[in-house]
Amino acid sequence: MALHLTLARPYAKAAFADGQKANQLEAWLAVFTAFSKIIKNKEVARQIINPKFSDKEIKTLLFDLIQTIEPESTKQLKDKIDHFLQLLIDEKRLMILPDIALVYQQLLNKYQGIIEASVTYVFPLNDEHRQQIQKQLEKRFNAEVKLKMIKDESLLGGVIIRAGNWVMDGSIKGKLTRLAENLKG
């Protein structure tokens, strides 16, 4: 995964720079999000790696799919998408499109002053608790925060909140682990 992100970074940065210059940041995001979903489809992935299909056939398949899913963004970026796909095909890097989408989203969030935070929980949080967590994080980081909710039954109870390198582990599992370490120490 880390290697794929490293490989994806220059492609995402290039598209981001182009998106800034041409005022097409959101169009690129829509395209990358759609490509990510397309590439994660097992049937499409099988066709991409199947040597029976030529590079031209693969490019046509992907372009047709992206045009169907994101017609407006594809229309705006038609030539750029064509060039981008050809570059990825030539470099044998089509399978890192989901990673390019992830890095691009991170670049866009940073540019827009948005922080993504994940809240891992066992028992679902009500809207009031979600809003309270979001407000506290926005206050702490002085930025808009997008919450991603992740269910994990291994926590036993409580929550773990992650935002960038910052982690707040308020889970029962985390407390038990820390208690066991203290008793050993």
Curated annotation (Swiss-Prot):
GO terms for biological process: proton motive force-driven ATP synthesis. The keyword Translocase does not apply. It comes from the Bacteria. One of its GO terms (molecular function) is proton-transporting ATP synthase activity, rotational mechanism. This is ATP synthase subunit delta. F-type ATPases have 2 components, F(1) - the catalytic core - and F(0) - the membrane proton channel. F(1) has five subunits: alpha(3), beta(3), gamma(1), delta(1), epsilon(1). F(0) has three main subunits: a(1), b(2) and c(10-14). The alpha and beta chains form an alternating ring which encloses part of the gamma chain. F(1) is attached to F(0) by a central stalk formed by the gamma and epsilon chains, while a peripheral stalk is formed by the delta and b chains. Keywords: ATP synthesis, Cell inner membrane, Cell membrane, CF(1), Hydrogen ion transport, Ion transport, Membrane, Transport. GO terms for cellular component: plasma membrane; proton-transporting ATP synthase complex. The keyword Ligase does not apply. It comes from Coxiella burnetii (strain RSA 493 / Nine Mile phase I).
